[in-house]
Amino acid sequence: MSIKFKKVDYIYSPETPMEKKGLDNVSFELADNSFVALIGHTGSGKSTLMQHFNALLKPSAGVINIVGYHITPETSNKNLKRLRKKVSLVFQFPEVQLFENTVLEDIEFGPKNFGATEEEAKNKALKWMKKVGISEELASKSPFELSGGQMRRVAIAGVMAIEPQILCLDEPAAGLDPKSRHDMMQLFLDYQKAGHTVILVTHNMDDVAEYANDVLVMEKGKLIKHDTPENIFADRKWLKKHNLSEPVTGIFASELNNYKFLKNPLTIDQLIDGIKNNLEGEFYE
């Protein structure tokens, strides 16, 4: 079941001197089981848009259809708990949301809140601890005794233990070292490949190029482009006009004098293949 936004507006502090439009006539449709990147400058409306996916914010105007739910300004909050099991959000620096006495209890909280038994919640917690790289030996420790990176992993495991159909992530790898970042992004990619939709808010264009198959670009509350990474990063004039960077692979390829690439390489593997083809007298295709 696709995600569909139709002419969605969102207004902060309506009918007050602080009134501000956070979303302006936003319409799009996303396919199931896709990996979607949501990009744009700070203040462009990315996080506001993300919070509409599970109705943490409801539209001031327009309609949202998602996992069988029809959301309008009049939708009652009473009907949204099951939606939030199907669509979960991971905010930037999610470790600040930790609150339980032990790592295990913190990860178990989400499944229990949505009806899992003690045994089911424990099994899910242990499963996702392993997947995010947290040793079972830490299960009985306070999450506040862990390193910053470990706390991040615990917080993400707590959301993923709910096993939502749609996982929304706001800069989840911000501040992590390169290896931890790669491992975390690979975890999200594996989750998408297992039959889920992943929506990633990010400023990192390398992650967009490496992982996404669909991109939404926000600017001043408006959706200004919806396309594939290949098409978006191929249009350097458009990127420059909107002050958006491109992946380091594309920048590197453009600096190689006398090398020709028929396609803009999005990943390291594509860049290497393109260089090899040039050295062998063939263009990258």
Swiss-Prot record:
InterPro entries: AAA+_ATPase, ABC_transporter-like_ATP-bd, ABC_transporter-like_CS, ABC_transpr_CbiO/EcfA_su, ECF_ABC_transporter_ATP-bd, EcfA2, P-loop_NTPase. Keywords: ATP-binding, Cell membrane, Membrane, Nucleotide-binding, Translocase, Transport. GO terms for cellular component: ATP-binding cassette (ABC) transporter complex. Pfam families: ABC_tran (PF00005). It is found in: Cell membrane. It comes from the Bacteria. SUPFAM superfamilies: P-loop containing nucleoside triphosphate hydrolases (SSF52540). Residues 3-245 form the ABC transporter domain. SMART domains: AAA. GO terms for molecular function: ATP binding; ATP hydrolysis activity; ATPase-coupled transmembrane transporter activity. It is a peripheral membrane protein. Its main location: membrane. ATP-binding (A) component of a common energy-coupling factor (ECF) ABC-transporter complex. Unlike classic ABC transporters this ECF transporter provides the energy necessary to transport a number of different substrates. PANTHER family: ENERGY-COUPLING FACTOR TRANSPORTER ATP-BINDING PROTEIN ECFA2, HEAVY METAL TRANSPORTER. NCBIfam families: ECF_ATPase_2 (TIGR04521). Belongs to the ABC transporter superfamily. Energy-coupling factor EcfA family. Forms a stable energy-coupling factor (ECF) transporter complex composed of 2 membrane-embedded substrate-binding proteins (S component), 2 ATP-binding proteins (A component) and 2 transmembrane proteins (T component). This is Energy-coupling factor transporter ATP-binding protein EcfA2. It comes from Lactobacillus acidophilus (strain ATCC 700396 / NCK56 / N2 / NCFM).
